[in-house]
Regions:
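Beta-strand/loop edge motif enriched in small/polar residues
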Residues: 13-242
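Conserved small/polar residues in nucleotide/adenosyl-binding loops
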Residues: 1-5
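C-terminal motif of bacterial Sec signal peptides marking the signal peptidase cleavage site
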Residues: 8-11
Length: 242
C-alpha cells in the first residue's frame, strides 16, 4: 500500500504591519508499494518516509519543480521502479526535479533504482537494493523518461555488498530516455549500469566517493556529454568499465 498524507505547517504572524504572511507550503508524505498510476504534482514538496516501490504496470509521474526529501533514517529509503513499471520524471531548465535528503551528507538516502527487461551478459539478476528482478531479451524496453533531475546525498549502504548509487540502471532498455541528470555529493557511484541498452546524455556527477560513471554486465548503450567533477581525494575513479 502506498502512503500519501499531507502535513501543513503555518507560521505565527509577527509582522508589525499586521499583514498575514503567506502559509508555508504543504508537504505530502510518500512511501510504500505503488500498484496504480501516481502523479506527484508540479511545484509540490514531498517527504519520502520509506522505500517507494513501483510495480507493473503502474507509472510514477513526477512533474516539474517537485522536491522529494528523504527522511533521516537508519532504514533504507529509496525509489525503485520494477520491471514493467515506469517513471516519467520531466523537469525543465528553470524548474528541475530535485531528490534530496534531510541528512545533508553522502549516503543520506538510497537514490533511484530502475529495473528493466533489456539483456545483460550475466543473464537475469536482482537489484542490490530492493531485491527486484532485472534482465531479459527486450533491447528496446521502455522504463520511462528522466529529464532535468538532480539527486543529492545518495549512496545509502545496507552492508559491504549491497550499496546504492545516485541512479542504478538494471537491465534498462533503449526505449528509456535519460537526459540532463545530475548527482551531487553521493556515496558509491554517481550513475551505474548493470547491463541493458539505455542511452544517456548530458549527465553530471559531482563529488561521489566511488566512481562517477560505472558500467558492468555488458551495458551496450551510448553516453554523450558526460561531466565528472571531483574534489574529494577519496574518490575512486571517474569511470569504471567492466
Amino acid at each position: 500500500m502506498c502512503i500519501r498524507d499531507r502535513a501543513v505547517f503555518t507560521a505565527c504572524n509577527d509582522d508589525e504591519n499586521g499583514t498575514t504572511p503567506p502559509p508555508a507550503p504543504s508537504v505530502e508524505n510518500l512511501g510504500g508499494i505503488v500498484t496504480e498510476n501516481m502523479t506527484l504534482t508540479a511545484n509540490t514538496e514531498y517527504k519520502l518516509t520509506s522505500q517507494l516501490q513501483v510495480k507493473a504496470p503502474a507509472v510514477l509521474t513526477i512533474e516539474e519543480g517537485v522536491k522529494i526529501t528523504a527522511a533521516d533514517s537508519e532504514d533504507p529509503i529509496y525509489i525503485l521502479i520494477e520491471q514493467g513499471a515506469k517513471i516519467n520524471a520531466v523537469g525543465t531548465v528553470e524548474n528541475p526535479i530535485v531528490m534530496t535528503a534531510e541528512n545533508k551528507t553522502a549516503g543520506g538516502w538510497g537514490g533511484l533504482h530502475i529495473c528493466g527487461y533489456a539483456p545483460t551478459n550475466a543473464g537475469s539478476g536482482f537489484s542490490e537494493i530492493g531485491n527486484a528482478a532485472y534482465g531479459g531479451n527486450d533491447a528496446n524496453d521502455n522504463s520511462g523518461v528522466l529529464k532535468y533531475i538532480r539527486l543529492e546525498y545518495t549512496g545509502f549502504a545496507l552492508d559491504d555488498e549491497h550499496e546504492s548509487n545516485g541512479i542504478s540502471f538494471y537491465g534498462v532498455g533503449a526505449g528509456t530516455q535519460v537526459s540532463y541528470v545530475q548527482t551531487y555529493v553521493g556515496a558509491d557511484d554517481g550513475l551505474e549500469f548493470f547491463g541493458g541498452t539505455v542511452n544517456v546524455d548530458h549527465c553530471v556527477v559531482v563529488d561521489c566517493t566511488d566512481d562517477s560513471f560505472d558500467w558492468t554486465e555488458g551495458w551496450s548503450g551510448t553516453a554523450t556529454n558526460l561531466v565528472a567533477y571531483q574534489t574529494d581525494a577519496s574518490c575512486d575513479c571517474l569511470i569504471e568499465a567492466d
